[in-house]
Amino acid sequence: MNKIIWKNKDSSLIDGLLISELPPITKPQMKVKETHIDGVDGSIVEELGYEAYDKTIKIGLRGKYDIDEVIEYFSGSSQVTFSNEDDKYYNATIVDKIDFERLARFRTAKVKFLVQPYKYPLNMGALSVDTATNLSYVINNIGNVKSCPKITLKGSGLVEIFLDDVSMFTYLFPQGETEVVIDSEKQD
């Protein structure tokens, strides 16, 4: 049975709601800057990251249903998990209109999610490293593209983060501060 988890709620828990079709598993389009130089074969391609893209589901209604509950469910921004990728989630927003009149009348409609380009492991817990006992710790990216981790440092003194034996980040905790968050996806 097809289902999604949206706003931390399983679609199968909404009376009368059916997820009749899930989106295909796709890779987002790469943003590129292409430069053509006269007299040079080909072009220079600069990769600029990935585009946000649409994932569309088809929904239906059956039996007893509350259209207002369905309308409320399919709104806003949240993490979404599709049952054909039930070990991953996407950060998504519903931005397009949904024809709920068609849904109520013909009991079918489409819902389009604007998803950010990366999907994340659903059950990946936080890693905790005690630097009093471990002076170094290796963390591997389990994905197939570059990783943009969120790192929370707790402690005092000087902390240095290396990537492939190259110092990437050094942080000195100011007096009285014991925690800092490095969100590499937001470059914050």
List where the protein language model places each region.
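Short beta-strand and beta-hairpin "edge-sheet" elements
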Residues: 23-25, 79-124
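Solvent-exposed residues in well-ordered beta-strands and their adjoining turns
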Residues: 60-62, 114-116, 154
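Solvent-exposed loop and beta-edge segments used for protein-protein assembly and interaction
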Residues: 49-51, 74, 103-107, 141-145
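Intrinsically disordered, low-complexity segments enriched in serine, threonine, and glycine
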Residues: 123-188
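Mixed-charge, glycine-accented linear interaction segment located at domain edges/termini
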Residues: 2-6, 114-116, 188
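Beta-strand secondary-structure signal
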Residues: 54-58, 110-112, 150
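Short, acidic/charged, Gly/Pro-enriched secondary-structure junctions
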Residues: 3-5, 58-98
